């Protein structure tokens, strides 16, 4: 993987201290999507990871909301289905719902029954790996539908939160950041 491409993406990230609450150092990935070159690099690097780290993916599951920014494009380029995992009351029909803890709150995820067939090989994608709570909730949804979880793919990992240690499936991240908890953080 080219250091120039990785550095280009890293230079697009913007940090916001004390957002969404005091003690959190928020990593804003949105500038990547405002730059067509950066977005193209992101998709190319994610596709390279899919092709080298994970085999024969049938479904890419994207987590609300920022997993939706690149999940469908990645699924299209990888020639597989895209399935959204959303907050409750955002999807119609029969759903499977699980609750989970995030680095600064509690939430729930839902997936439509029948969107993943038993035995399909599933890769979960999201923007940031923090505590691993959202990924674990998505793991449970995939498993309940009978999918075979092959791994997780993230744009950025906040290493000080050690979310990777909670995940059982192979995990790949393009970028790493925040090796230590921010000063004044509840995680310090």
UniProtKB/Swiss-Prot annotation:
Catalyzes a salvage reaction resulting in the formation of AMP, that is energically less costly than de novo synthesis. One of its GO terms (cellular component) is nucleus. It holds the Pfam family Pribosyltran. The keyword Iron does not apply. The gene is apt1. GO terms for molecular function: adenine binding; adenine phosphoribosyltransferase activity; AMP binding; metal ion binding; pentosyltransferase activity. Keywords: Cytoplasm, Glycosyltransferase, Magnesium, Metal-binding, Nucleus, Purine salvage, Transferase. It catalyses: AMP + diphosphate = 5-phospho-alpha-D-ribose 1-diphosphate + adenine. Its EC number is 2.4.2.7. It is found in: Cytoplasm; Nucleus. HAMAP family: Aden_phosphoribosyltr. This is Adenine phosphoribosyltransferase. Coiled coil: none annotated. Its cofactor is Mg(2+). Homodimer. One of its GO terms (biological process) is adenine salvage. It comes from Schizosaccharomyces pombe (strain 972 / ATCC 24843) (Fission yeast). AMP binds at residues 130-134. Belongs to the purine/pyrimidine phosphoribosyltransferase family.
């Amino acid at each position: 993987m080219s250091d120039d491409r990785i550095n280009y993406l890293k230079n697009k990230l913007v940090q916001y201290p004390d957002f969404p609450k005091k003690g959190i150092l928020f990593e804003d990935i949105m500038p990547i999507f405002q730059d067509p070159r950066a977005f193209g690099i992101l998709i190319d690097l994610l596709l390279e990871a899919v092709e080298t780290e994970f085999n024969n993916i049938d479904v890419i599951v994207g987590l609300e909301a920022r997993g939706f920014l690149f999940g469908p494009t990645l699924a299209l380029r990888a020639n597989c289905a895209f399935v959204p995992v959303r907050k409750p009351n955002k999807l119609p029909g029969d759903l499977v719902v699980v609750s989970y803890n995030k680095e600064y709150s509690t939430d729930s995820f839902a997936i439509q029954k029948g969107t993943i067939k038993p035995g399909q090989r599933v890769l979960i994608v999201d923007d940031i790996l923090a505590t691993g709570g959202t990924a674990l909730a998505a793991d449970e949804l995939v498993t309940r539908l009978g999918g075979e979880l092959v791994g997780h793919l993230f744009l950025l990992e906040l290493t000080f939160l050690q979310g990777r240690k909670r995940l059982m499936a192979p995990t790949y991240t393009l970028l790493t950041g925040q090796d230590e908890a921010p000063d004044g953080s509840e995680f310090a």
